[in-house]
Structures are given as structure tokens and as C-alpha cells.
A protein has these predicted regions:
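Glycine-rich, low-complexity segments
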Residues: 1-41, 82-84, 92-103, 109-111, ...
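Short beta-strands within extracellular/lumenal beta-sheet-rich domains
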Residues: 34-52, 116
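A short beta-strand element within beta-rich, extracytoplasmic domains
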Residues: 54-72
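Short consensus segments that form the blades of beta-propeller domains
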Residues: 69-77, 145-148
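Short, surface-exposed beta-strand/strand-loop-strand elements in extracellular ectodomains
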Residues: 72-90
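Exposed aromatic-hydrophobic patches
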Residues: 107-122
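Noncatalytic modules at the cell exterior or secretory-pathway interfaces
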Residues: 121-141
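Extracellular carbohydrate recognition
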Residues: 141-156
Length: 163
């Protein structure tokens, strides 16, 4: 084809996509922000500086729960592990990785993964805002205290940029 194509409006499935990696290779058992590939630990105020406006359109998570213990009796609750994708420290997408908010869902040590997608425009950001990922671990105390130790955490966030 010898001419340029011009579209007035949004093309479904169109847009430039970017993929941002976050992770932690060491062990941790409390809430923390994940690092970027350069090893710099992100915070609620420091993450990937987004080069242009767009939307968060997908998230993929893989973790290894290297150690899991419950709260002992009477209810034997397990820690709740949640991954949160944030823009400038504000939650955009939250997904349970293991357990339940009330501690009632049990799980074993081992690898766990999940992924989720959403439509363009659901969770948006502006150029210059910061993208970061936080892993939140909530423990429960009864006769003992539940705990989960994570290692080898990898999170990939897909963003679709506006034209």
C-alpha cells in the first residue's frame, strides 16, 4: 500500500503497549514495594515515571511462598497476600495472590501465579505520574501469628499508551 492510513477515533486493540517489570529475589514476610530491574526499590512516591498518558490493561504475577504458617487455634487463619498496582501511591488494581481478607482461606507453600486484564480507560494515568507495585501481607494473631515468606516475586504490568 502506497499511502498512509488515518483513523479518526480509537482503534480497538490499538495503541502502543509498554511492559514494566517489578520483582524481589530475596525473602520478605511483610508489606513492601517491589524493585525495578535496576534493583532500585520503589516507594509510594517513586516508581516508573510514565512517559505518556495511558491505561493499565494487564497484570501478571508469579510468586514463591517459601514458608507458610497459620495462626494456630482456634481458627488456624492464614496470612492474606495482595498485589497492588499503584499510580503515585494510589491503588488502581488489587488482586489477592494467596489467602482471604478474613484469613479463612488456607494455602500451602509453593509457587502461585495469576493474571488479570481490563479494558483501556478503566485505570488511567497521565504522563509524569509514577507506576509502582506493592505486595501487602496481612497476618492474623490468635494462639500464634500467621506468617508467609515470599521469594522470587515477579510482576509484569502492561500499559496501553494514548496516541
Amino acid at each position: 500500500v502506497g499511502t498512509d492510513l488515518s483513523v479518526g477515533g480509537h482503534m480497538t486493540g490499538g495503541g502502543l503497549r509498554g511492559y514494566f517489570a517489578f520483582g524481589e529475589g530475596g525473602n520478605f514476610n511483610s508489606t513492601q514495594y517491589l524493585s525495578g530491574p535496576d534493583g532500585a526499590t520503589h516507594t509510594a512516591a517513586f516508581g516508573y515515571d510514565m512517559p505518556r498518558a495511558g491505561s493499565i490493561t494487564a497484570v501478571s504475577v508469579c510468586i514463591n511462598a517459601s514458608s507458610v504458617s497459620d495462626s494456630s487455634g482456634p481458627d488456624f487463619k492464614h496470612s492474606h497476600v495482595v498485589g497492588k498496582v499503584q499510580i503515585d501511591g494510589t491503588d488502581k488494581i488489587s488482586a489477592t495472590i494467596a489467602g482471604a481478607a478474613n484469613g479463612d482461606t488456607s494455602y500451602s507453600a509453593g509457587k502461585k501465579d495469576l493474571r488479570t486484564t481490563q479494558s483501556i480507560g478503566t485505570d488511567t494515568f497521565s504522563a509524569g505520574e509514577n507506576l509502582m507495585v506493592q505486595i501487602v501481607i496481612t497476618n492474623f494473631t490468635q494462639a500464634g501469628t500467621s506468617s508467609t515468606t515470599l521469594t522470587d516475586v515477579t510482576v509484569i504490568v502492561e500499559c496501553t499508551f494514548d496516541a
